[in-house]
Amino acid sequence: MPSLSITRQGWIAYAIAAVTVVLDQISKLWILGLLGREPGASLPLLGPIHLTMVHNYGMSFGLLRDSDWGRWLLIGFSILVVIGLAVWVHKATRPLLAVGIGLIIGGAIGNNLIDRVIYGYVVDFIDVSRLYFPWVFNIADSGISVGVALLLLDSFLSEENKLSHQTE
């Protein structure tokens, strides 16, 4: 029978996922209190950075935004991704991989599970469109993006490490 104990990398990933979810949800409660739920409400923050209320009903680039079943499809997909990543992290041996997985798990739970179940859409509010980045995003989105970048970096570093050991 397989062991149900959580590995060191698992603890790292779950702690980072929990922090990501908490920061994401606190920031969304704060922004909803500050701007209300009305889409388009905006407040300049610092230079080119604004806080702008956006209801994101779809996924990247607005995919599935007009679909009645898209919300539930995204919730189901997110559950599968979180389960898959939770299994993967227990096989992980490198902390960087665990950190990346934790950020992605936290982002998936914050955006596609909590927001879509509670609001029916994802609450986006970080607006840097004046810096030529047209998408409004949130902390969970940032967690997913940074997490994916860390997975790529970990993959590159582990391959480089394998190559250096082969040439010795």
Swiss-Prot record:
Main localization of the protein described in the UniProt heading: membrane
Protein name, UniProt field: Lipoprotein signal peptidase
InterPro entries: Peptidase_A8
Compartments, record wording: Cell inner membrane
Bilayer topology: Multi-pass membrane protein
Protein family according to the UniProt entry: Belongs to the peptidase A8 family.
Catalytic activity: Release of signal peptides from bacterial membrane prolipoproteins. Hydrolyzes -Xaa-Yaa-Zaa-|-(S,diacylglyceryl)Cys-, in which Xaa is hydrophobic (preferably Leu), and Yaa (Ala or Ser) and Zaa (Gly or Ala) have small, neutral side chains
Keyword Membrane: yes
One record GO biological process: proteolysis
Active site: 124, 141
